[in-house]
C-alpha cells in the first residue's frame, strides 16, 4: 500500500471548571500527521516543529505504542510506517496534546490494519485507553461534549452541547505541567456533602450552557470543588489572569484540563482588548484567541 493517510486532529480543553473528567471542547489548534508505509526496518518519524522533535523515535513513542496496542486488540499486524508530524498544540500544557496523538494512533492502526472501526468504536477505544472522555470525545467529534466512561462495562456515553456563543482565549505559560503531577495535587476523597455540592453546580452549569445563559454558566464554571482549588497554586499566573479577565467583564476564567493553560470565556465585544491586556501584563505567558473546532478529526487518503 503506497497511499498516504493524512490526519488533521484538533486540540481540546477539558473540564470547563466544574466538569471534571467529563466535559471537553475542541479547539482550532491542530496535530497534522501524514503517514505512509516505508521500506525501512522500523517506524520512521519526521518532525516539522521544534516541540515534536523532543519526542522519542523508538518503540516508546506514544503513537507507535497506541497503534500497536490497537492492532494487537484486533489481531492485525501493522507495516513499518513513516510518520510526518507537525503540531501547533503545545505539549503538556492542558490542551489535549496526548488525546490528539491517541486519536491519531487509533486512526493509523485502523487504516493500515484495515480494521474498519466506526467512529463510535474509535470513541470507545480512545476512552478505554485514556480513562475518561473529556478530551478524546471532542477531539473525535468536534464541538462541546459531556461524557461518562463506565469502567466496569467499558462503555462510553456522550451528549453534544450547543457551541457556546462566546470568544475563547487561551493563556499558555512557557512551562510544562505534566498531567500526572497535576493529578497528584488532588485529594483522594471528597465528603458526601462536597460531592453533592459540586455535582449540583456542574449539572446547573451544563443546563445554563444548553440555554445559552453564559452569565450563569460562567459564574458556575468558577465554583468548582473537584480539582481547581487544589491545582491553582501550580499555576503562578492564574490569579493575575483571572483578575484581568474580570476587569474586562469575562464570563469565566478556569484551568484548561490539568493546566497550566488558562481558559477564558470572553464576551465578543471585549475579547480583543482582553487578549492584548493579558499579553501586556502577563509576560510569562502567551495569550491568544482561538476558535472552537466543530468538525473533529479529519481524515484524507492521498492515492499514489
From Swiss-Prot:
GO cellular component: cytoplasm
Residues given in the record as ATP binding sites: 90-100
Pfam families hit by this protein: GHMP_kinases_C, GHMP_kinases_N
Location of the protein in the cell: Cytoplasm
Residues forming coiled coils: none
Highest taxon listed in the record's lineage: Bacteria
This enzyme's EC code(s): 2.7.1.39
Single Gene Ontology BP annotation: threonine biosynthetic process
Pathway listed: Amino-acid biosynthesis; L-threonine biosynthesis; L-threonine from L-aspartate: step 4/5
Reactions it catalyzes: L-homoserine + ATP = O-phospho-L-homoserine + ADP + H(+)
Main location: cytoplasm
Listed GO MF terms: ATP binding; homoserine kinase activity
InterPro entries linked: GHMP_kinase_C_dom, GHMP_kinase_C_sf, GHMP_kinase_N_dom, GHMP_knse_ATP-bd_CS, Homoserine_kinase, Ribosomal_Su5_D2-typ_SF, Ribsml_uS5_D2-typ_fold_subgr
Broad enzyme group: transferase
Entry keywords, A to Z: Amino-acid biosynthesis, ATP-binding, Cytoplasm, Kinase, Nucleotide-binding, Threonine biosynthesis, Transferase
The protein's role, per its UniProt record: Catalyzes the ATP-dependent phosphorylation of L-homoserine to L-homoserine phosphate.
Entry similarity comment: Belongs to the GHMP kinase family. Homoserine kinase subfamily.
The protein's name in its UniProt record: Homoserine kinase
Record organism: Staphylococcus aureus (strain MRSA252)
Name of encoding gene: thrB
Amino acid at each position: 500500500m503506497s497511499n498516504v493517510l493524512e490526519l488533521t486532529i484538533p486540540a481540546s480543553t477539558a473540564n470547563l471548571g466544574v466538569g471534571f473528567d467529563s466535559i471537553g471542547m475542541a479547539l482550532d489548534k491542530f496535530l497534522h500527521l501524514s503517514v505512509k508505509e516505508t521500506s525501512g526496518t522500523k517506524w520512521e518519524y519526521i518532525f516539522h516543529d521544534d516541540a515534536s522533535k523532543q519526542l522519542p523515535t523508538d518503540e516508546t513513542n506514544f503513537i507507535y505504542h497506541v497503534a500497536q496496542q490497537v492492532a494487537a486488540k484486533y489481531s492485525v499486524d501493522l507495516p513499518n510506517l513513516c510518520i510526518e508530524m507537525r503540531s501547533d498544540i503545545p505539549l503538556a500544557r492542558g490542551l489535549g496534546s496526548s488525546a490528539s496523538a491517541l486519536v491519531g494512533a487509533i486512526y493509523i492502526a485502523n487504516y493500515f490494519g484495515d480494521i474498519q472501526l466506526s467512529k463510535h468504536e474509535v470513541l470507545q477505544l480512545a476512552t478505554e485507553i485514556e480513562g475518561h472522555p473529556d478530551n478524546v470525545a471532542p477531539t473525535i467529534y468536534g464541538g462541546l461534549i459531556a461524557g461518562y466512561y463506565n469502567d466496569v462495562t467499558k462503555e462510553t456515553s456522550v451528549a453534544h452541547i450547543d457551541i457556546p456563543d462566546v470568544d475563547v482565549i487561551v493563556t499558555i505559560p512557557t512551562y510544562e505541567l505534566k498531567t500526572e503531577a497535576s493529578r497528584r495535587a488532588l485529594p483522594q476523597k471528597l465528603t458526601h456533602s462536597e460531592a453533592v455540592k459540586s455535582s449540583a453546580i456542574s449539572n446547573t452549569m451544563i443546563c445554563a450552557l444548553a440555554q445559552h445563559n453564559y452569565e450563569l454558566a460562567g459564574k458556575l464554571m468558577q465554583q468548582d470543588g473537584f480539582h481547581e482549588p487544589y491545582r491553582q497554586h501550580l499555576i503562578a499566573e492564574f490569579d493575575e489572569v483571572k483578575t484581568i479577565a474580570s476587569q474586562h467583564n469575562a464570563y469565566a476564567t478556569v484551568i484548561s484540563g490539568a493546566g497550566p493553560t488558562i481558559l477564558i470565556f470572553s464576551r465578543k465585544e471585549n475579547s480583543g482588548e482582553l487578549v492584548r491586556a493579558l499579553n501586556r501584563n502577563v509576560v510569562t505567558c502567551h495569550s491568544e484567541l482561538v476558535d472552537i473546532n466543530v468538525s473533529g478529526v479529519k481524515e484524507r487518503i492521498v492515492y499514489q
